[in-house]
């Protein structure tokens, strides 16, 4: 699960001007009807993964992968965008990967001591001042808030997916399954996603090949051609979060509650383990405040289906 960083003292500045809309790097999905929610009864009650309910979506486009460090760097270079983590001056880093002077270690999160608030941690320095993203251009960008993700999407001529679009896309055409590839976590003894193995939060055996983030085209894509819809990094959705929303959700193209305190997160991350998180299931939900950031928060973009490819933004 992600953890909130304290809110910046100043309000976020207006985002960049919207670019012409683009479907570059995206897969077109036909839409249609699907059963949304947890059919296995494995979710946390407070997450509101039930009742399973029928949703019907119009066709839409969605990114094949999470947004990478390289793509986010292009956005920052073009716009001068300053992330919420940079504005506040610190962000949440998992305790085993902190790379910062002792003076930059500002303390742990209440109830989640494995999360350390690190001065100077942000998307360019994801583990702290002694880290950088050299050699990681194709890893998902992290330490990005919902506000940052929305600003990027606007610049790229895209938008964030709705929660319903995200789950439909993540399922890869499989109905009623636990994961994007079926019901077994490791079919044939092979890992299909980047999550925690070992004893959380102190021992990660990295059987899946990764201790932290993995390149965005690791493992296999799902049936829709989307990569890493389970694990690696949490992905922001456009919706406000409510644990009771599924009981009142409209059937056609739901967009979430009209207001709220937190935005929806989907997909789980490299820190998910069944003893702690278990949110790499395709129906799993989480949430965080729009200005929160951490070393396992990222995003991918979506768009309407009546568009043609073409923006030069990326």
From Swiss-Prot:
UniProt keyword annotations, A-Z: Calcium, Copper, Metal-binding, Oxidoreductase
Binding-site list for Cu(2+): 272, 277
Cofactor binding, note field: The catalytic copper is required to activate oxygen and catalyze oxidative C-H activation.
GO molecular function annotations of the record: calcium ion binding; cupric ion binding; formylglycine-generating oxidase activity
Compositionally biased residues, Low complexity: 1-20
Pathway where this protein functions: Protein modification; sulfatase oxidation
Catalysed transformations (reactions): L-cysteinyl-[sulfatase] + 2 a thiol + O2 = an organic disulfide + 3-oxo-L-alanyl-[sulfatase] + hydrogen sulfide + H2O + H(+)
Record-linked Pfam families: FGE-sulfatase
Disulfide topology: none
Residues covered by region (Disordered): 1-31
Binding site for Ca(2+): 194-195, 208, 210
EC number(s) from the headed UniProt entry: 1.8.3.7
Required cofactor names: Cu(2+)
One GO BP annotation of this record: protein oxidation
Family, as annotated: Belongs to the sulfatase-modifying factor family.
Biological role: Oxidase that catalyzes the conversion of cysteine to 3-oxoalanine on target proteins. 3-oxoalanine modification, which is also named formylglycine (fGly), occurs in the maturation of arylsulfatases and some alkaline phosphatases that use the hydrated form of 3-oxoalanine as a catalytic nucleophile.
Name of the protein described by the UniProt record: Formylglycine-generating enzyme
Protein source organism: Streptomyces coelicolor (strain ATCC BAA-471 / A3(2) / M145)
Classification of source organism: Bacteria, Bacillati, Actinomycetota, Actinomycetes, Kitasatosporales
């Amino acid at each position: 699960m992600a953890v909130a960083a304290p809110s910046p003292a100043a309000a976020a500045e207006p985002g960049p001007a919207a670019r012409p809309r683009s479907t570059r790097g995206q897969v077109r999905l036909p839409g249609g009807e699907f059963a949304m929610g947890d059919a296995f009864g494995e979710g946390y009650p407070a997450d509101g993964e039930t009742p399973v309910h029928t949703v019907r979506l119009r066709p839409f486009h969605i990114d094949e992968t999470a947004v990478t460090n390289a793509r986010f760097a292009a956005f920052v270079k073009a716009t001068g965008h300053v992330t919420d983590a940079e504005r506040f001056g610190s962000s949440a880093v998992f305790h085993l990967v902190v790379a910062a002077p002792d003076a930059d270690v500002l303390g742990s999160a209440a109830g989640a001591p494995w999360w350390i608030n690190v001065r100077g941690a942000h998307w360019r320095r994801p583990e702290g001042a002694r880290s950088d993203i050299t050699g990681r251009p194709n890893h998902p960008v992290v330490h990005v808030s919902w506000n940052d993700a929305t600003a990027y999407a606007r610049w790229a001529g895209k938008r964030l997916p709705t929660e319903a679009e995200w789950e439909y896309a993540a399922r890869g055409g499989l109905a009623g399954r636990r994961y994007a590839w079926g019901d077994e976590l490791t079919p044939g003894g092979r890992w299909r996603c980047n999550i925690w193995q070992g004893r959380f939060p102190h021992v990660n055996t990295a059987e899946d090949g990764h201790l932290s983030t993995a390149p965005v085209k690791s493992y296999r894509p799902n049936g829709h051609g989307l990569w890493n819809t389970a694990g690696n990094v949490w992905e922001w959705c456009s919706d406000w979060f409510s644990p009771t929303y599924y009981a009142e959700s409209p059937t056609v193209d739901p967009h979430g509650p009209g207001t709220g305190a937190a935005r929806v997160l989907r997909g789980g991350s490299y820190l998910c383990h069944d003893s702690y998180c278990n949110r790499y299931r395709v129906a799993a939900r989480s949430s965080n405040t729009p200005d929160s950031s951490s070393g396992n928060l990222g995003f991918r973009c979506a768009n309407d289906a009546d568009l043609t490819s073409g923006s030069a933004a990326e």
